[in-house]
Design a protein with these regions (language model features):
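N-terminal active-site segment of His-dependent metallophosphoesterases
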Residues: 104-184
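Short glycine-/polar-rich loops that comprise or flank the Walker A/P-loop
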Residues: 12-14, 38-43, 90-93, 165, ...
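Active-site environment of divalent metal-dependent phosphoester hydrolases
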Residues: 132-135, 175-178, 204-208, 267-268, ...
Length: 378
């Protein structure tokens, strides 16, 4: 019954606290499994109190008065053995309260999940995949009403909107285009000043692994980005690495009415936190097949979407942004000679600027038609 109730609460997205002994690893494993099934992060709060306190409190309970002392002693031993294994078992955070005083004095404060920004209501300007097209990004921000802030060398390092609007980037800032460092400098500055949000794209994820010293294939424009970054100083590259590590998979905004991610996200994953959620948000899903160009066939999740929140994303280039079932893909192939597109929210107005040129030849032509109606609205 316990696990059934826990599963129902987690499925509904409700705070779930399990008050149980759970000193055996197998008992905890069932709860960790439930957390993973529902894409939430389990937290352990360990009450490590002296044996005599446990005995006194058990004696004061009518349903536990006859509990043998040896049972309490066994529980104590099992608890102590468990302290070093909880994180390896899958608990994201472990809090150990030692002694009755700590247990009595502790204050439990709920923290928002790092993707939960429902309290931010905008207005927002959601920007599609930039892919190193710094000049086009500056032009788009200007058209959206932002004033660029330049550093001592004349490089765009921030942007301010007179009406306090917030830019939200769907990821894939880098690769393929002529100035990935310039795009990073501008977006990092906007995020640092609180004037922008940014989620991770698959290209940031790959660049981050490279900067972390891991072996990755320098394909799909990464080689150009690495070459461009080599001309920057070490402090800038270190700042880029830190920035990428801090990017989350998606944001839930405006009271839950807007979800921004890189590759799309079904409703069951909104506000959830797991490797499965992050993978979908960064890469989307595929059918397991490849097309005539050797590229994976994308699973058409948006065709089945019926969620309340509008999902705005990028990742898959299309010649024109169009709404489909309250989802909108903003990747209009700027680096391939298309456009750089933004969505004004809550106005649901599309704003775009043309690419200055074809910066990178696509593996296959952009799709002939974008999702949604001709007016770009649902």
């Amino acid at each position: 019954v316990l696990h059934f109730i826990v599963g129902k609460r987690l499925a509904a997205g409700r705070l779930t606290v399990v008050d149980a002994t759970n000193v055996q690893a197998e008992s905890r494993a069932q709860l960790v499994r439930l957390a993973r099934e529902h894409d939430v992060l389990p937290v352990a709060i360990v009450l490590d109190v002296p044996e005599h306190v446990c005995a006194e409190r058990n004696a004061a309970r009518a349903d536990r008065a006859g509990l043998p002392r040896r049972v309490i002693q066994r529980h104590q031993r099992e608890l102590r053995r468990s302290l070093g294994t909880l994180e390896r078992e899958g608990f994201r955070t472990v809090h150990v309260l030692r002694g009755a005083r700590e247990v009595e004095d502790v204050e439990v404060v709920r923290e928002r999940r790092f993707n939960d920004l429902r309290h931010l209501t905008g207005p927002f300007d959601v920007v599609g995949d930039v892919h190193g097209c710094r000049a086009e990004l500056e032009t788009l921000l200007d058209r959206l009403g932002y004033a660029l802030v330049r550093d001592a060398e004349g490089r765009a390092a921030d942007a301010v909107h007179p009406e306090g609007r917030t830019a939200v980037f769907v990821g894939d800032l880098v690769d393929r285009g002529p100035d990935s460092p310039g795009v990073l400098r501008l977006v990092m500055g906007m995020v640092a000043s609180g004037r922008a949000l940014c989620v991770s794209g698959n290209h940031e994820n790959k660049l981050g692994r490279h900067l972390d010293g891991r072996t990755v294939q320098h394909t799909h424009g990464l080689a150009e980005t690495v070459e461009q970054l080599a001309k920057e100083d070490e402090a800038f590259r270190a700042g880029v690495a830190t920035f990428i590590k801090g990017l989350v998979s998606h944001y839930v905004l405006d009271g839950g009415a807007l979800v921004v991610c890189h590759a799309g996200l079904p409703e069951k994953y909104h506000g959830r936190t797991s490797g499965r959620v992050r993978s979908f948000a960064l890469y989307g899903d595929t059918t397991g097949e490849t097309d005539e160009f050797g590229l994976p066939v994308r699973y058409p999740w948006a065709e089945e979407y019926r969620g309340r929140a509008a999902v705005v994303y990028g990742h898959t280039p299309t010649p024109r942004a169009g709404w489909l079932n309250n989802t909108l893909c903003l990747d209009t192939g700027c680096t391939f000679g298309g456009k750089l597109t933004a969505l004004r929210w809550p106005e649901r107005e599309l704003v775009d600027v043309p690419a200055e040129r074809v910066w990178y030849e696509p593996t296959k032509p952009l799709a002939a038609e974008a999702p949604g109606g001709a007016d770009g609205r649902p």
